[in-house]
Amino acid sequence: MNGLPSTEAPGGAGCALAGLPPLPRGLSGLLNASGGSWRELERVYSQRSRIHDELSRAARAPDGPRHAAGSANLGSAAGPRRPVNLDSALAALRKEMVGLRQLDMSLLCQLWGLYESIQDYKHLCQDLSLCQDLSSSLHSDSSYPPDAGLSDDDEPPDASLPPDPPPLTVPQTHNARDQWLQDAFQISL
């Protein structure tokens, strides 16, 4: 109804987008009723306020129509147990929202950690590639002059050149997240 693809959740809990958990029970009816427009949302809010006022008046007058019908019929006529008033419904919604906020923050932290790990891994691969390119260019045969017909008695040609640099290694990080990536992809560095 709001223009988004939705599927009905089991048990009629409301609409859920593909790949996302279903909406909290307290919001699903509001979203379906609003149709996505703010004017409709205002209308629903005023209707909810009117219902809250009626519930408050009914709670203050125990001899109202609900009480006259008898307590035996009250449970069967109401169907599934629902919150008695708007305050308890809001408290239940608040609890659900806190849980969703905690889940959201947890997922956000995990995504951020994964993003950082991917960036670290990219930099590590780039550094390794750069080191390998540099090492191969230093040790390639074309970078050294060929033997100029020297005899065994002459000084070796490497004596005039500086000694070979130590082999280049990628610095090892001490981050558990990087270790997890190396273990997960079985990369030997």
Curated annotation (Swiss-Prot):
Keywords: Cell projection, Cytoplasm, Leucine-rich repeat, Phosphoprotein, Receptor, Repeat. Residues 159-169 have a biased composition (Pro residues). It is found in: Cytoplasm; Cell projection, Lamellipodium. GO terms for cellular component: cytoplasm; lamellipodium. Residues 55-81, 141-174 are annotated as: Disordered. Interacts with SKI. Interacts (via LRR repeat) with CDC42BPA (via AGC-kinase C-terminal domain) and CDC42BPB (via AGC-kinase C-terminal domain). Interacts (via LRR repeat) with LIMK1 (via LIM zinc-binding domains). Forms a tripartite complex with CDC42BPA, CDC42BPB and LIMK1. Negatively regulates TGF-beta-induced signaling; in cooperation with SKI prevents the translocation of SMAD2 from the nucleus to the cytoplasm in response to TGF-beta. Acts as an adapter that mediates the specific recognition of LIMK1 by CDC42BPA and CDC42BPB in the lamellipodia. LRAP25-mediated CDC42BPA/CDC42BPB targeting to LIMK1 and the lamellipodium results in LIMK1 activation and the subsequent phosphorylation of CFL1 which is important for lamellipodial F-actin regulation. This is Leucine repeat adapter protein 25. It comes from Rattus norvegicus. The lineage of its organism: Eukaryota, Metazoa, Chordata, Craniata, Vertebrata.
